[in-house]
């Protein structure tokens, strides 16, 4: 039996135990995971160092190396995520609503785990921990398929996780990791309907579209982030600058980083030289439309290919627009439905923007970087969904459950 099928069967069998585990048992398992991550910190960081060195040897962009790299702070963040998830309310068993028919039949809608989940992701090893602890807390087993560039890091992390589970009531095989990096396994994995209840791809457009278009297992699509910030004519320009810098430069390789900046034409002459200079101080390559280049001639000319592109790098494209309506139309055309922001002091424009922009998260006077499970108070997230069905935005514990109807009768029969 090959590795994929063997491990898929294991997570399916383990789910029969995990879905009935108590909150105490699940929290104990997550606490043990946090302890093992700390105990085996040196081993994990050494494995990650090897991955990072190999990535740099291959000429991988530094913004993508940043997604791959671990350090003590990021290990601490993983441990903190474990502690946060332990403190979150267990959604399993929650009675969503209930009612009693006239004949006394009692009907309740009760939250239950989805089932074994397959996660296909690329270079971020912290995803291994975040997805695992959320899956366990919500009663779901997990089959992980990480990117080849993070193989050593992921093996070290999963080894620590499985060692932790051995010391708890939760089956060790509740978490399995596919070590074979053959890409053909992705296609096999997303068609394992017999064993997996859901597949979640986390990565770039190519991975997500491949999974969406080829899976027979239901897919929760985590989206590409071509995120925009629109600076309205009424915006406080002094306050706007740090918001834009934060959105673009804090973690440029993440899906909630701003990729496009739209500026109202009435403030363009005043604002563009300031923001371009500040972006460049932070190492950002600035591209711009013709109107932008009339004001700041030395920016790189933006082409049509720029507007739909998620750079995941220190690059931003700027477009001057006539008004909020043109900004909205531009975003409607090029948005991936992830996170969009308006900076404004005009209530009507803010209300219009929020109403007309179709995205998982729409912001008024805030950085797009807040679209994150931890920032939204969900603890760690398993991904950020840009689809409309089942879950949208950061996918936390509740979004990893479904429900069943529990019907209590007194030997009722239907008339």
UniProtKB/Swiss-Prot annotation:
* Keywords for this protein: Amino-acid biosynthesis, Cytoplasm, NADP, Oxidoreductase, Proline biosynthesis
- SUPFAM superfamilies in alphabetical order: ALDH-like (SSF53720)
Q: What EC number(s) does the entry state?
A: 1.2.1.41
Q: Which biological process annotations from GO are given for this protein?
A: L-proline biosynthetic process
Q: What does the record give as its pathway?
A: Amino-acid biosynthesis; L-proline biosynthesis; L-glutamate 5-semialdehyde from L-glutamate: step 2/2
Q: Where, subcellularly, is it found?
A: Cytoplasm
Reactions catalysed, semicolon-separated, are: L-glutamate 5-semialdehyde + phosphate + NADP(+) = L-glutamyl 5-phosphate + NADPH + H(+)
Q: Which InterPro entries match?
A: Ald_DH/histidinol_DH, Ald_DH_C, Ald_DH_N, Aldehyde_DH_dom, G-glutamylP_reductase_CS, Glu-5-SA_DH, GPR_dom
Q: Which GO CC annotations does the UniProt entry carry? A: cytoplasm
Q: What one GO molecular function would you report for this record?
A: glutamate-5-semialdehyde dehydrogenase activity
Highest taxon, organism lineage: Bacteria
Q: Which family does it belong to?
A: Belongs to the gamma-glutamyl phosphate reductase family.
Query: Which NCBIfam families does the record associate with it?
Result: PRK00197.1, proA
Question: What does this protein's UniProt record list under function?
Answer: Catalyzes the NADPH-dependent reduction of L-glutamate 5-phosphate into L-glutamate 5-semialdehyde and phosphate. The product spontaneously undergoes cyclization to form 1-pyrroline-5-carboxylate.
Q: What is this protein called?
A: Gamma-glutamyl phosphate reductase
Record organism? Thermotoga sp. (strain RQ2)
Q: According to the entry, what is the taxonomic lineage of the organism?
A: Bacteria, Thermotogati, Thermotogota, Thermotogae, Thermotogales
